[in-house]
Amino acid sequence: MELKKYQLQVIKDLDRFLELLIEKQNISKAYNALWNEKGINVGIDGMPPYNPELAGVPQVCFKVPTGGGKTFLAANSLKPIFASMPHIHPKAVVWLVPSDAILSQTYKTLTDKNHDYRKKIDVDFGNKVEIYSKQQLLNGQNFNPTSVSDNLSIFVLSYDSFRTSKKDGRKAYQENGSLLPFVRFKQDSGTL
């Protein structure tokens, strides 16, 4: 499966944003510079200003119509994102979807080693990829500091995974002995 022309342009824009981010060492300045290079103002008469919802975490949004290949774009975005980051960090992705219906479909797709999306990710990361559901994470199933250090770890979650109005959603906030090895991992390596 190959990227379409407009998808290739999206990935090129992502690459350029990441270059500008490294150059400017400031997310908002990189965002403004990218749009300025395209001749588009940022502010009242152009693109909205960068919204730093998570301080220090670059937020990238691809606006693509239904059927436009958002999941394939996301799969193709992982390599450029991690290539631009220092190699000392574990490679971890929260693949957040809007609903539980899309969650099961996305999880099935990403765990199917014969699916084009998974094939792309496997090629880009040398087949060192682990896909986790919320339940696997909470149970510590194949999820440990060594796995996180050695592989690209993709956590497929939905917004519902964190909703506290549902009993299942509250489990993400409970203390969990299955995740205890990460405390020492964090203290030893300072990487999380």
Predicted feature descriptions by range:
Residues 1-192:
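RecA-like P-loop NTPase motor core of helicase/translocase proteins
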